[in-house]
Amino acid sequence: MYKYFAVFILTLKEYFSYRLNFLIWRLRVFIGFLVPFFLWLTVTKQVKNFAGYDEKAIISYFFFSHFLSYFILGTRTVDIASQIQSGEILNLLLKPISFFRYHFFRDLADKILNLFLSFFEIFLFFEIFSIPFPSTNFQFLPLFFLFLILGLFLNFYLNLLISFWGFWSTEIWAPRFIFFILISILSGSFFPLDVLPKELFSLILFTPFPYLFFLPVKMISSPETLINKINLNSIFFMGSFWLIIFFFLSCFFWQKGLKNFSFWGR
Amino acid sequence: MFKKIKRNLKILLLLTYNSLKITSQSRQGMIFFTLGKILRFLLLFGIIFLVFSKTKIIAGWSLKQVIILYLTFNFIDTFSQVLYREVYRFRPLVVSGNLDLILVKPYHPFLRLLLGGVDLFDLLLLLPYLFLLLLFIFQENVSFFSFLLYLVLVVNGLIIATAFHIGVLGFGLLTTEIDNVIMIYRDLLNLGRFPIEIYQQVISLIFTFIIPIGVMITFPVKALFGFLSFKNIVFSFFISFFLLWLSVKLWQIGLKRYQSAGG
Amino acid sequence: MIVVKNLIKIYKIYQKTGRLITDIFFRKYEEVLALDKVSFEIGKNELVAFIGPNGAGKTTTLKILSGILFPTAGYVSVLGFFPFEKKEAFLKQISFIMGQRNQLIPDLTAMDTFLLNKEIYEIDDYQFKKNLQKLTAIFSAEKIIHQPVKMLSLGERMKMEFIAALLHQPRIVFLDEPTIGLDIFSQEAIREFIKDYQKEFKATIILTSHYLEDVKRLAKRLIIINKGKILYDGSLTAILQRFSQIKYVSLILEKKVKQEALFKIGKPIVYQLPKVIFQVEKKELPRIVAYINNKIPYLDLVIEDEKIEEVIKSLFKNQR
């Protein structure tokens, strides 16, 4: 197990050598955050109750959304596809280390580092613009952690799956691009999913999207408005269902990919 | 004089033709990317409708006005991306040293470095955007003069975009960090998808007068509906030509300080 | 054609301290003197080779002469132009070929790049056809000009680079390490090509290389440069006359000779009977040859020059 801890530390070290790049990356993430935040702030300032959200609730939602965004959605598994293409992946496969676990710990280091920074950023931002800090309902914290773990693993396996496209095609950016667009709109990072009309929202709950990001963030920011509208058991069941699907699909395509791929290039 | 223009045009056409040949080699990618862009366009469009189904006005802007703003943004963003695609490939040219072989050719390097990668396929996407934009504009009661002013200011916005891309090239001669610079520009530009008024005072001021996103996108639409002050119109032209001049200066300085790769 | 007087080029290399704020706002830089008051003149139809170790300043010189780099100080005139200004009339008359760098578009065929260059250099149809034919004939490369460049081998690609660069019949050709990384056969082909090209088109060719083979085969004039200073500017044969103090005397002995007799010549560097080789100073040669003729019974006596490589190496060593 120690070797995975080493992976963790190594990933952190990598970040420190690419400091400038990393900080510019955080700047970009923050700029991206400004659009939905201000849009919805302006909307709720004007309309006191927008689909169940008032100013306070929207501030709370986006506070936690920015804080958790990279932690849940961020990943380094994007590198995998190009590593397959270049043959670099062989280096990892020939070592006595589990591929899945290696990338999981790499991601973990990545996520924790970004978590600290995003908290720092959002804290500073709220201070400077004198926006009141939101609070959270501790009663729902266990639910939050449940959906957080579900979301983390769901994202992990889904991202792996997309990276495995590299086994069959040289154009690895294409599916990731589409996936990225779908996620940025439908995950809940641009708008809280439950502002959608009731029918649409119920439909979306059958897709994997809400479980990727929206549900954990909702549970920590303003769970009260959601709890009465949905059946907790059924959404938890749905989320787990998708997790199992992605888990088996990624294992399956991993095995298939290894067999079929001829590791051309270097 | 005309001979020169004709020759430059011929070179440009050849470069564009070559660029088309290269992109058609990766058909799969082309389809996916186009699909992705259309998807994003539609989804964000949907959000606008979603917001306005529950409220009539946002920060002084009506639904139709916000739509026209969004479509204007799309047009300017897509158009400059189509034209200046080659700028995104500048860094590998500098790092590999192949840039030198371009600088030694007897034609203006901008023909190749700025305009040499025109994406004809993406250009096709521009047509439906343009069509939608004009459709929505003509549904409103806009005077001919306002529409003219709008067009001029859109072109002005494109000049700012051009200045920016030239600036990136100049920067690229001095440092290898330009990938980040381009990406920050795209992120900042994205702030212009919605009216600049939704941002709180300080930020809104910054993005109008210092990093002129507001000038590029919000101003033309404001002019269309007669909300743009004369002062701001003058400022718009001033800033675009200033930035253009600045960017060309940056390129020239970059050339003098250029140290080339390897040896 | 080319006049360079007291050319100075200083590079500013930024030092990364590892501390973030320092690296962005208070960058420290080190100044490297790449060219230190370099002067020379090159006329029409010359083939000049610049040699020197890595970092000597060869490529820097070429890049300044072609207008890519801005000189820090000094006078540079090529074909009457100041190269950095990159005037079209100037650029149309020169060409730059760098080994390991490409002007060919990798995803398309070489012919596609040729056609682009035809427009850029404003070559008329007849001239284009004629030059293309001549150049491809020298390389016997008629078939490969229509293949995607990324599919070609390194040697084939280099040949295509040459054709692309010479279609417009430049008056001055700059070649920066043109044979680097190529196999022996490709190197040979490129060397033959350069020789033939100069004969046919009467261009001025300036070549930099690490390979002495390139220099020996092609250049009549040699400029040796190290640490930004010109150490030698003259013909290849004259360099031995000027700098070499050493001759090698090889003996094949007829019969066994007493060691003391042999050692009177000096300490041999090769002592594998019947072969003995001595390293002697030039000025001692007459005395030693006379001695050998009188006292040593030999089957064969050969006197050889020091290898040019050795001469040049010692030139660099002495500079320190």
Give the ranges of each region predicted by the language model.
Chain C
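Conserved ABC ATPase "signature" region
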Residues: L20-D23, L115, E119, Y126-I144
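Conserved ABC ATPase signature
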Residues: D107, P148-G155
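Short, charged/small-residue-rich alpha-helical element at the C-terminal edge
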Residues: Y248-L315, R320
